[in-house]
A protein has these predicted regions:
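Single conserved hydrophobic/aromatic residue that forms the stacking wall/gate
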Residues: 1-11
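A structural signal for short hydrophobic beta-strand segments in well-ordered beta-sheet cores
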Residues: 103-107
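Internal helix-loop-helix
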Residues: 12-81, 125-131, 207, 250, ...
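Glycine-rich phosphate/cofactor-binding loops in nucleotide/flavin-utilizing enzymes
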Residues: 33, 37-38, 57, 199-206, ...
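Glycine-rich beta->alpha junctions and the first turn(s) of the following alpha-helix
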Residues: 160-255, 324, 340
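A short core secondary-structure module
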Residues: 101-102, 113, 117-163
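Short, charged, amphipathic alpha-helical segments
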Residues: 240-244, 272-278
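A short, Trp-centered hydrophobic/proline-enriched beta-strand micro-motif
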Residues: 81-89
Length: 347
């Protein structure tokens, strides 16, 4: 965590944490292209970079839906690099079907208190986070999309317990977060109380650009191409064809990702382009890492101390990026969004 925070402090001093945000909230007032380039570069360099949950998800959502109090409090602490955010959406029985969340947020109008009880899972960086944006059911007996609220809580509040979940790549970036009588107030609700569904969906559009996968894919492809050159594999016809094909597909996904991010700045509608770019970016990233893994297959079958850092990174990333078609909304859900919202097809 310390290197991440130290890096954020350096970026903060140059006001590059959120360059496209208004100056009053610590940004530079630049166009979205600066933020895109920055995110892609951080991913390419495998750098901890910015807090993507804060800078690219809840931050833009607060800018769009938040109150003056929320903007002043939460946006400035993000651009000062003081906090790490995490996302509280998925539950043990509510993943792709997000509207089925059951975590309760009982609202007491007398003392303006929301009492939260429930369990969230697959919470990336929950063990490091200072704050969480969480989707809860604040209207008793409500069903599906109705009666939901997007609420901000402090991870140090009484009643918040974080349990790490170890994944196949050996890391524990995912967590289970148990919430037992966690209290917050309506001033920490983004948008209107009980009407958070569309706010929560709009937030996902900020997440689903796929720009990180572009940076990671570019880095892996450059590295494996260098490896092939150094080990006399580059003249192999199959290797050359695969490298060329992957490079072309990556560039296509990159253009789609840029387009999706640009369209998001032009209108407020929840559209299909972020879903399209997420599918393309995650799938090409998986293909690139599969290719790299196959090239190195004799060297990277298990984690052990005899492997060089490059081989270890390829293996770890290959195992992790398999989840790209699940994280942030499954590929199947993205295809449904494209069909229904983009092409007007029936459910």
């Amino acid at each position: 965590l310390r290197p991440r925070r130290q890096r954020q402090m350096c970026i903060r001093d140059s006001k590059w944490i959120a360059p496209s945000w208004p100056k009053v909230y610590g940004g530079l007032g630049e166009d979205i292209s600066k933020s895109i380039i920055l995110s892609e570069t951080f991913a390419y360099r495998m750098s901890p970079g910015n807090d993507r949950f804060g800078v690219r998800m809840i931050g833009p959502t607060i800018l769009k839906y938040g109150t003056d109090y929320q903007k002043e409090k939460f946006l400035n602490e993000i651009t000062r690099g003081e906090v790490q955010w995490c996302q509280g959406y998925s539950e043990p029985n509510s993943g792709s079907d997000l509207a089925s969340v059951v975590t309760k947020g009982d609202y007491n109008e007398e003392n303006d208190t929301i009492t939260i009880n429930g369990v969230k899972v697959w919470t990336t960086l929950g063990h490091r986070a200072d704050r969480m944006f969480i989707l809860v059911r604040t209207l008793p007996d409500s069903n599906r999309h109705h009666g939901l609220s997007l609420v901000l809580i402090d991870m140090k509040d009484p009643g918040v317990k974080v349990n790490p979940i170890k994944n196949i790549s050996g890391s524990s970036s995912f967590n289970e977060v148990v919430l037992n009588n966690v209290k917050t107030s309506s001033k920490n609700v983004i948008g209107k109380l009980h009407e958070g569904w569309m706010v929560a969906l709009d937030l996902l559009n900020f997440e689903r650009s796929g720009i990180d996968y572009i940076g990671w894919g570019e880095r892996c492809l450059d590295d494996i191409e260098d490896y092939c050159k150094k080990n006399n594999l580059i003249e192999n016809e199959s290797v050359k064809n695969n490298l060329s094909s992957l490079r072309a597909s990556l560039e296509s996904a990159k253009i789609m990702t840029y387009k999706a991010l640009w369209i998001k700045t032009q209108n407020d509608e929840i559209n299909m382009e972020p879903s399209m770019s997420k599918i393309l970016a995650t799938e090409i990233n998986i293909k690139i890492h599969d290719f790299a893994f196959n090239i190195l297959s004799k060297k990277v079958t298990i984690f052990d101390d005899s492997q060089d850092s490059f081989s270890k990174r390829i293996l770890k990333n290959r195992l992790f990026f398999v989840s790209g078609g699940i994280l942030g909304g499954t590929t199947e859900i993205q295809k449904n969004i494209i069909a229904q919202r983009g092409l007007g097809l029936p459910r």
